[in-house]
């Protein structure tokens, strides 16, 4: 199953191809997407994205996982999260969210089994 493209991105709003929902923050993987609710794992801008935040997407069999740190890159990504993914053989790309969406969509177009977690505000 292919990863859905990110159809649109603006401050505080993301749309994923194949979904009628608008997300503030979202997780995407081959065949699906959902809201990324930081309250589930106690995520805050610092220390940032934890392994628990990316575990669900990593378990979907992705080759690459793209992390969008926000429009102003306020969301941190500690080395422990990158190491968690790399130990599973997953290529990790950590970028400002607009750049992350471009990278993610380019990987989708190449047929890569890509997933992502994206923060669409600060």
UniProtKB/Swiss-Prot annotation:
Tissue: Widely expressed, with high expression in the adipose tissue and skeletal muscle (at protein level).
Coiled coil start-end: none
Calcium in keyword set: no
UniProt keyword annotations, A-Z: Cytoplasm
Tree of life domain: Eukaryota
GO annotation, cellular component aspect: cytoplasm
BP GO terms, sorted: negative regulation of apoptotic process; positive regulation of fat cell differentiation; positive regulation of transcription by RNA polymerase II; transcription by RNA polymerase II
Region (MTH138-like domain): 6-122
CDD domains in UniProt: Mth938
Pfam families named in the record: DUF498
Subcellular location: Cytoplasm
InterPro entries: AAMDC, MTH938-like_sf, NDUFAF3/AAMDC
PANTHER family on file: MTH938 DOMAIN-CONTAINING PROTEIN
Job of this protein: May play a role in preadipocyte differentiation and adipogenesis.
Family: Belongs to the AAMDC family.
Protein name (record): Mth938 domain-containing protein
């Amino acid at each position: 199953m292919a990863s859905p493209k990110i159809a649109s991105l603006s401050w505080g709003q993301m749309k994923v191809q194949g979904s009628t929902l608008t997300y503030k923050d979202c997780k995407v993987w081959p065949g699906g997407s959902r809201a990324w609710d930081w309250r589930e794992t106690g995520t805050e801008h610092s220390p940032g994205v934890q392994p628990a935040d990316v575990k669900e997407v990593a378990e979907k069999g992705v080759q690459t996982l793209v992390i969008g740190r926000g429009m102003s890159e306020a969301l941190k990504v500690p080395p422990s999260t990158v190491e968690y993914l790399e130990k599973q053989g997953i290529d990790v790309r950590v970028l400002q969210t607009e750049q992350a969406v471009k990278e993610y969509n380019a990987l989708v177009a190449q047929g890569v089994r890509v997933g992502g977690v994206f923060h669409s505000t600060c």
